[in-house]
């Protein structure tokens, strides 16, 4: 196992044919601070450059796959605050620009463009998810070609109901959930169960959590037996079909809407906060009611 990373782990398995990347901030529920995202991009590119690697697994250590963006841990604050602990990425890629331009360029580079790059990685990628997959965690998962989930996994994007945002930066929701289910989940903040995700075709396999890592590896080994050219062209055929149906252009358009949403809140708050707050009628995201599954015969499921 590689010791080159602080926020992730990287190892090669199956005689080098499989690379496994694990988000490794379990104490922060694998919240995505800037250091984690930069390391994750480097790990994906490392696997892509390795001609022995055929399949890349992406998972998370701890009780859940990921809780999404890091919204303000001490570590995350230190990363963007000028000083000795500031992450270098907060001095480039638009970080020194003013107004909406700075946030737009930073989010484009580290949230949006990164995710699109991983979606088109020249390897087959498998997301190994468990526990909860919230908000920006959906982006990491959806960038993968296939998804293997543990029993009981839940999927939710609560940025609408808790931050007043129209969705995360890589807005693949209508393509993954379906149009009306996306509207329901975004407008209520409810979660999709793993069984529903399987029925939608979003999730390929569901296993007991205790067996998840083992079964995902077995699945990856099976996929790795496919000739690399055939695997790559099969992936490319599907991705190009989606892009020709409008996926790529829709992502770009929705990223722009996301930035408009940020600019709205920044203007409302005199350029202090680019998201909705309690004073805007939203719950405090730290103390908001628990996320519950969307149930067909209940307005809100029991907690």
Residue ranges and their predicted role:
Residues 1-16, 65, 73, 77, ...:
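C-terminal alpha-helix plus adjacent terminal tail
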Residues 1-63, 75, 301:
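Conserved CoA-thioester-binding segment of acyl-CoA-metabolizing enzymes
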Residues 21, 58, 70, 140-142, ...:
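Hydrophobic/aromatic residues within transmembrane alpha-helices
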Residues 35-39, 110, 117, 215, ...:
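Charged catalytic carboxylate motif
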Residues 60-113, 161:
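Glycine- (often His-adjacent) and acidic-residue-rich active-site loop
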Residues 113-122, 128, 134-186, 215, ...:
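CoA-thioester-processing core
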Residues 148-149, 203-212:
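Short acidic-hydrophobic, aromatic-tinged amphipathic segments that line or gate anion-handling sites
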